[in-house]
């Protein structure tokens, strides 16, 4: 049968992974689909299956996804953040919208459904059904109810939207589906398949045995072809940075015969895509080898000491050894751990690996000998906790240095990354540290990137427009948390991705007087991930970031107004010439003297 193009959606690439979501109506006469509208909104459109004019049925600058038709053809369900995250219902005809939730009853269709849509004012017939935000596809069951996963558990929403109920507990469920009988569900949990009743209750693991031949070479060839095809369809630059992507496929296909291990295969893919000279293109090989977890002792070691014991160099504030009952001082020696004598060699880590409780007994002395030592018992830190503590102490020390040098007039705030948790932290700390300051230093050095720079810029563009004053109360600047004072941004060669977009935007919008530090690396592009046969993971750049002058930020990092290099010796000594320069530039400007 001849294929027919219903509608072309530039940039969505249905043939690749990701892109547009679409759903056929119960009578196969309509298609509901999502596509980007404007700069950031995703709206839902409906188009006749035989072609015709598509209609935007959500019409709001918000995120809409997962369109799902009701089995009776009266409603279209979807996820959105248009009025808070949750589940929404669109009535396809006005009479279905006017029915109150109390009177709304599901009647199972007795004959094939014919979907009728009145598009006049359809975007005004939207109702929020549940504030529970789904993390899976929506499933409209034969009984009229909706099912979905959230936080690894199954949720059920009644046809009228008056009841949202969690039918399972314990989480960890993925790949959820309702069976054809409408009474049972299947899902994956812990890598195994289960079946259970749709309304909860006992779950049965589905076990089976099967012989199969794992053709590793064929699997890798399939992964190679899919990797190449995905980049061919979805790489942001159709010109592939001036490279011949077809020729690169042939070049590296010839090398497939020399690949023996998963790591070698992922390396080959990285070499092929590396010729595009684009960032965010990592390929990760699967690993079935369990890696031991090594907790952190909670102090740094002075490696100049040779011989018995670990000489303690520093014990950071907040580490177990900084508290009175478990105090360990700088310069003391750890003679043994749980009775095993130690020194600063690789055997030390074998004593720490894979300890679930991480509780140890240390023998501590002020000299490298067992005689006269005391016992200290505490729980070791995880590597993540150690990194977080070290980071917090460094930020606190830098903030204190800025406030001390400026006599409390200049505030300091570090942005470690650009995730939602970093946004919440920024808003919390900005309110705390901006108050009473004449100027601020925003530091994105070593920022790992993310996606919130636009939100931060919006926040910093809030400007005062008035003052609110109550009787016997201090005046309040309106709007709340508005900032209209001096700013300098610190950045360096380890500010990545969205952490590079932030200083550019601060300068472009006139929010920062100066950018101080070292040019960023130009690791700037919007990316997404995809999977390959064999368990390989890859990332692909899908959207470029251009400055207002048209220059691409990819491989073209942001340059500072004032270049200040930090030498290794300065870093080791705890000096910060970049901060010093920012403080110098933010000193009050001298006023001109009248003759």
Regions found by a protein language model. Name each.
Residues 255-308, 370-398, 578, 583, ...:
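Extended, small/polar residue-biased N-terminal targeting/export presequences
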Residues 292-345, 420, 543-544:
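PDZ/PDZ-like domain segments forming the peptide/carboxylate-binding groove
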Residues 234, 311-313, 318-320, 335-533, ...:
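Cleft-lining beta-strand/loop regions that shape enzyme active-site pockets
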Residues 1-20, 35-36, 45-63, 91-111, ...:
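Multi-bladed beta-propeller domains
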Residues 70, 74-95, 186-206:
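Blade-level signature of beta-propeller repeat domains, shared across WD40, Kelch, NHL, RCC1
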Residues 8-34, 41, 55, 59-77, ...:
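Conserved beta-propeller blade repeats
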Residues 202-276, 280-282, 304-306, 310, ...:
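Terminal targeting/pro-maturation regions of precursor/exported proteins
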Residues 37-40, 82-84, 153, 193:
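Short glycine/acidic-enriched loop and turn motifs that connect beta-strands
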């Amino acid at each position: 049968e001849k294929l027919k193009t219903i509608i072309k959606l530039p940039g969505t690439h249905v043939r690749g992974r990701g892109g547009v979501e679409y759903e056929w109506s119960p009578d196969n006469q309509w298609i509901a689909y999502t596509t980007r509208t404007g700069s950031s909104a995703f709206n839902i459109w409906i188009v006749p299956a035989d072609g015709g004019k598509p209609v935007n049925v959500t019409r709001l600058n918000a995120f809409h996804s997962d369109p799902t038709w009701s089995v009776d053809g009266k409603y279209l369900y979807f996820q959105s953040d248009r009025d808070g995250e949750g589940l929404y219902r669109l009535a396809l005809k006005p009479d279905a919208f006017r029915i109150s939730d109390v009177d709304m009853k599901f009647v199972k269709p007795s004959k094939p459904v014919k979907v009728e849509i009145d598009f006049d004012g359809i975007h005004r017939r939207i109702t929020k059904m549940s504030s529970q935000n789904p993390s899976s596809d929506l499933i409209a069951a034969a009984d009229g109810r909706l099912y979905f996963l959230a936080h690894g558990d199954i949720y059920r929403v009644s046809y009228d939207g008056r009841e949202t109920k969690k039918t399972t507990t314990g989480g960890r469920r993925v790949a959820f589906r309702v069976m054809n009988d409408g009474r049972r569900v299947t899902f994956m949990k812990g890598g195994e398949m289960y079946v259970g009743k749709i309304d909860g209750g006992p779950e049965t693991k589905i076990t089976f045995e099967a012989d199969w031949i794992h053709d590793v070479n064929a699997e890798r060839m399939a992964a190679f072809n899919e990797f190449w095809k995905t980049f061919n369809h979805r790489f942001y630059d159709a010109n592939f940075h001036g490279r011949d992507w077809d020729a690169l496929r042939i070049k590296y296909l010839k090398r497939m015969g020399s690949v023996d291990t998963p790591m070698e295969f992922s390396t080959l893919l990285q070499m092929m895509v590396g010729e595009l000279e684009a960032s965010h293109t990592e390929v990760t090989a699967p690993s079935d080898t369990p890696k031991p977890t090594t907790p952190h002792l909670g102090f740094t070691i002075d490696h100049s000491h040779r011989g018995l014991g670990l000489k303690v160099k520093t014990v950071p504030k907040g580490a177990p050894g900084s508290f009175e009952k478990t105090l360990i001082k700088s310069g003391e020696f750890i003679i043994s751990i749980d009775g095993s004598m130690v020194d600063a060699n690789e055997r030390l880590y074998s004593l720490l690996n894979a300890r679930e409780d991480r509780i140890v007994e240390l023998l501590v002395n002020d000299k490298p000998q067992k005689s006269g030592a005391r016992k200290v018992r505490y729980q070791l830190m995880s590597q993540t906790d150690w990194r977080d503590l070290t980071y917090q102490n460094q930020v606190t020390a830098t903030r204190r240095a800025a406030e001390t040098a400026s006599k409390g007039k200049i505030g300091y705030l570090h942005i470690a990354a650009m995730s939602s948790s970093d946004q919440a932290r920024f808003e919390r700390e900005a309110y705390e540290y901006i108050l009473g300051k004449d100027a601020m230093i925003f530091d994105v050095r070593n920022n790992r990137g993310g996606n919130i720079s636009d939100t931060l810029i919006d926040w910093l563009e809030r400007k005062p427009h008035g003052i609110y004053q109550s009787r016997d109360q201090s005046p309040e600047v309106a709007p709340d948390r508005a900032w209209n004072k001096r700013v300098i941004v610190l950045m360096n060669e380890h500010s990545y991705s969205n952490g590079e977009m932030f200083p550019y935007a601060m300068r472009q919008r006139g929010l920062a007087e100066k950018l101080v530090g070292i040019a960023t690396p130009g690791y700037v592009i919007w990316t997404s991930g995809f999977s390959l046969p064999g368990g390989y993971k890859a990332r692909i750049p899908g959207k470029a970031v251009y400055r207002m002058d048209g220059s691409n930020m990819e491989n073209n990092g942001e340059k500072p107004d004032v270049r200040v290099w930090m030498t290794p010796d300065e870093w080791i000594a705890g000096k910060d010439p970049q901060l010093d320069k920012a403080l110098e530039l933010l000193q009050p400007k001298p006023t001109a003297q009248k003759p």
